[in-house]
Amino acid sequence: MSGRINVVQGDITRIDTDVIVNAANPSLMGGGGVDGAIHRAAGPSLLAACKVVRQQQGECQPGHAVITEAGDLAAKAVIHTVGPIWRGGHDNEPQLLADAYRNSLELVTANGYNSVAFPAISTGIYGYPKAAAAQIAFETVSDYLTRRPQPKQVYFVCYDEENFLLYQRLLGQYDE
């Protein structure tokens, strides 16, 4: 496990990985936060690809993930996953958040990619408590990686200092 999980602070649209995960909304049509940043950086072809996915299968439900081209991003693909809206933790939010990470990793593996960058899913406008979300992210990704050789590298890309420090602390615990 050591060395396969990395924590960085910065702009996920500038990370050099095969795949960037987008914390999308169910419509897949872009929005605020990381979703808006990824759509702006990728250009109109990402929105066009999302429209095709939406026409084929409708909205993306919480915990689910879909893959599209990456548009103008350096990445080869974007995986759009919808995390849960925090409703106090009694509406299956932990399972849905774990599913968002796991289903994204399954798409990375199924498409033969070696590296993926995750944002802190659901911790923005969806209001998931950051520490709890970070714990679920690490547990889910670590569990996945212990049983599979792919992806070779997973990056947690934290935009803000609070998430960065939470993820750094967890990385230290998982590397021990």
UniProtKB/Swiss-Prot annotation:
It catalyses: 3''-O-acetyl-ADP-D-ribose + H2O = ADP-D-ribose + acetate + H(+); 2''-O-acetyl-ADP-D-ribose + H2O = ADP-D-ribose + acetate + H(+). The keyword Ribosomal protein does not apply. Residues 1-175 form the Macro domain. It comes from the Bacteria. Transmembrane segments: none annotated. The active site is at D35. Its EC number is 3.1.1.106. Deacetylates O-acetyl-ADP ribose to yield ADP-ribose and free acetate. Down-regulates ribonuclease 3 (RNase III) activity. Acts by interacting directly with the region of the ribonuclease that is required for dimerization/activation. Homodimer. Interacts with RNase III. Belongs to the MacroD-type family. YmdB subfamily. This is O-acetyl-ADP-ribose deacetylase. It comes from Cronobacter turicensis (strain DSM 18703 / CCUG 55852 / LMG 23827 / z3032). The lineage of its organism: Bacteria, Pseudomonadati, Pseudomonadota, Gammaproteobacteria, Enterobacterales.
